[in-house]
Amino acid sequence: MQLSDFSFELPDELIARYPLETRSASRLLHLDAKGQYHDHMFTDIIDLFEEGDLLVLNDTKVMKARLKGKRTTGGAIEILVERMPNHTTAYCHIKASNSPKAGAELFVGADNIPVIVRGRHENLFVVEFSQPILPVLEQYGQLPIPPYFNREAEEIDTERYQTVFHNPEKIASVAAPTASLHFDEELLAKLDQKGVKKTFVTLHVGAGTFMPVRTDDITNHVMHSEWCDVPQETIDLILATKARGNKVIAVGTTATRALESAAQAHGGKIAAWTGDTQIFIYPGYEFCIVDRLITNFHLPESTLLMLVSALSNRENILAAYEHAVKDRYHFFSYGDAMLIDKLEVLKLKLG
């Protein structure tokens, strides 16, 4: 399967660079189990879900992971904190005119807080901070909004690039689980009143989510690693949901990857799991847990577009995207949403 199979043309003006005034006011394109698409508003999910269905949400919180700073020579640098193995050590991306070497001292924030580059961890720099990292990020950092916004983070992003249900103890993502940004408290309350249940997984989104696929044959692509947790409480609710014939609805590709990673770790069984995942879902993948997916519109040739193409199929997804472009849906993190049903497989009866 070739990378070019997942290409499409997107006019620049359809990229949403700011959020709508109301989270749930976005549009929704429903791609059903027969591969047919239908136009809706996002709040129509109340009617598209059944009592007893289960929403699975990613409760991670985005950290202000981008720090501006300088070298001892005064040259500008930018640090993007990706992971924190402990409270004073971070694995980071560093933008600089020349790549810093082990032992280099850098300074971040208005108060010139010193940090030391200790070496490399895979493709990331190991950076030691002179004080706990999270307070430094909170005081001096910026939210690492996506590059396709073509702007710096603003005050509005502080609220709107976080989900309303994030767990403040789980602050470790460098990008939002953006499908969840459509949910506000009022919509969640209405779903609760209908009897739609909800539960949580955690996947801390890494900067690799924005990395392009660089291999023509997509099966040669190596996914970035992200930490996730699928707790037993969530598994119990999933098993109960499937036992009564209801649907498991993953909110976002991150929740999907967490759930399917747990299943893959147990040989296809539905079971709790915590660990690092590099799961790469593309057409041909057999989903173990997810029945339906709420997701945004994704970049051409991205691993996320490949994932959604595995749930329906590539032709259906690209046809839906073509309709979305013609009908002026908005794309990417602050854009509109899709509800994608797992494609029905027709089984022929032989007489």
Swiss-Prot record:
Q: Per UniProt, what is one Pfam family of this protein? A: Queuosine_synth
Concerning InterPro entries, the annotation shows:
QueA, QueA_dom1, QueA_dom2, QueA_sf
Pathway(s) this gene product operates in, as recorded in its UniProt entry: tRNA modification; tRNA-queuosine biosynthesis
Q: Name one GO biological process term.
A: queuosine biosynthetic process
Q: Does the keyword Cytoplasm apply?
A: yes
**What are the entry keywords?**
Cytoplasm, Queuosine biosynthesis, S-adenosyl-L-methionine, Transferase
* Classification via Gene3D superfamilies: QueA-like (3.40.1780.10)
Any one Gene Ontology MF annotation carried by this entry is: S-adenosylmethionine:tRNA ribosyltransferase-isomerase activity
Main location as per UniProt: cytoplasm
Coiled-coil region(s): none
Q: Catalyzes what?
A: 7-aminomethyl-7-carbaguanosine(34) in tRNA + S-adenosyl-L-methionine = epoxyqueuosine(34) in tRNA + adenine + L-methionine + 2 H(+)
Query: Where found in the cell?
Result: Cytoplasm
Work out whether the entry's keyword set contains Cytoplasm. Answer: yes
Gene Ontology CC annotation, any one: cytoplasm
Q: What does this protein do?
A: Transfers and isomerizes the ribose moiety from AdoMet to the 7-aminomethyl group of 7-deazaguanine (preQ1-tRNA) to give epoxyqueuosine (oQ-tRNA).
Subunit-level organization: Monomer.
* HAMAP family linked: QueA (MF_00113)
Family in the record: Belongs to the QueA family.
UniProt name for this protein: S-adenosylmethionine:tRNA ribosyltransferase-isomerase
Organism taxonomic ancestry: Bacteria, Pseudomonadati, Pseudomonadota, Gammaproteobacteria, Moraxellales
